[in-house]
């Protein structure tokens, strides 16, 4: 081994942080999205004030309510009808909502399964709603002939947990229910507030850029033996 190789090896050993758990955000980290397409789709339905309720990271009003699971889809459709002043077929609302989503590249689906084979525990922690997540289960996670639970050990979804990021309580509940130690856990998220909240609890974090290929990151976080 040359001196340069030895120095690189020492530097890698110092920098590497073994972890047991990897937690992925969904939108912007695994699945790409098109916010403008979603806004335009709702405007075509007559929902002209949609941009008051929807953004890439946190929602407001009744869009926040369906994301934190405090209203049912049926109640949510009725709220939209009242907002626009006329009835809209729920299927058309679903289509407009899910137009926000694009796809997960195959290499990222392969990455998730490979991480599990290497010995990591792989989780999802996402602010999402039942309509969008059911669409993803059918149209994204099944495209390789598998199911979503072939890619993750466990799912932590805001609408099921009745709480959303970046609130501290959702991270604490994830750690407790997933039996995770913060210092053995890496969160990959594209929201600065989410990363800051997780870091404050001692979780290792990585702020991902939209549609980033971050596979090389795991050299720095090898699986804990």
Spell out what each predicted region is.
Residues 62-66, 112, 152:
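Generic hydrophobic alpha-helical segments
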């Amino acid at each position: 081994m040359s001196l340069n190789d030895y120095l690189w090896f020492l530097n890698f050993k110092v920098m590497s942080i073994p972890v047991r758990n990897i937690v992925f955000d969904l939108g912007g980290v695994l699945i790409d999205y098109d916010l403008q397409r979603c806004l335009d789709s709702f405007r075509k339905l007559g929902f002209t004030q949609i941009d008051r309720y929807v953004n890439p990271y946190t929602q407001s009003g009744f869009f926040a309510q369906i994301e934190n699971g405090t209203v049912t889809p049926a109640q949510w459709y009725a709220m939209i009808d009242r907002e626009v002043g006329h009835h809209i077929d729920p299927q058309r609302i679903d289509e407009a909502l899910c137009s926000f989503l694009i796809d997960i590249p195959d290499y990222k689906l392969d990455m998730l399964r490979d991480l599990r084979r290497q010995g990591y525990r792989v989780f999802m922690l996402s602010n999402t709603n039942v309509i969008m997540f059911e669409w993803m289960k059918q149209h994204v996670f099944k495209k390789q002939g598998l199911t979503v639970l072939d890619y993750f050990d466990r799912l932590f979804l805001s609408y099921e947990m009745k709480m959303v990021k970046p609130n501290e309580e959702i991270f604490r509940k994830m750690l407790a229910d997933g039996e995770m130690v913060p210092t053995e856990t890496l969160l990959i998220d594209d929201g600065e507030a989410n990363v800051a909240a997780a870091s404050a609890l001692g979780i290792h974090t990585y702020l991902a850029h939209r549609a980033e290929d971050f596979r090389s990151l795991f050299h720095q976080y090898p699986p804990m033996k």
